[in-house]
Amino acid sequence: MSEESQASQASQACQAKACAIQDCLQGNGYNEAKCTKYIDDLYQCCKNFYEENGVDAKSVCCPKFKLLQLKLKQRSLGQIDATLLENKRH
């Protein structure tokens, strides 16, 4: 595989997982709590991506390595999803 092809493949890493999150959010009124499985899948894909390509690798679909580590730690502590605030008008 050429260097250019590898770079292109790396930049597209986890794209299907990121698209699945967008589809889920759009289908559920942007309620993140209903898309937890897809978010977990993306983070796992990104974790694998960094393990295979190094912490300085780049993918448009993955958070930077340090942020991914923070997100994974938060999720392990049960701080999983953003809460959807309802706008109530009187």
UniProtKB/Swiss-Prot annotation:
GO cellular component: mitochondrial intermembrane space
Family (UniProt): Belongs to the CMC4 family.
Superkingdom, taxonomy of origin: Eukaryota
Motif (Cx9C motif 1): 14-24
Subcellular compartments: Mitochondrion intermembrane space
Coiled coil segments of this chain: none
Disulfide bridges in this chain: 14-45, 24-35
Name of the gene this protein is made from: CMC4
Name used for this protein in its record: Cx9C motif-containing protein 4, mitochondrial
Motif (Cx9C motif 2): 35-45
Record remark on domains: The twin Cx9C motifs are involved in the recognition by the mitochondrial disulfide relay system.
Domain (CHCH): residue spans on this chain: 11-53
One Pfam family here: CMC4
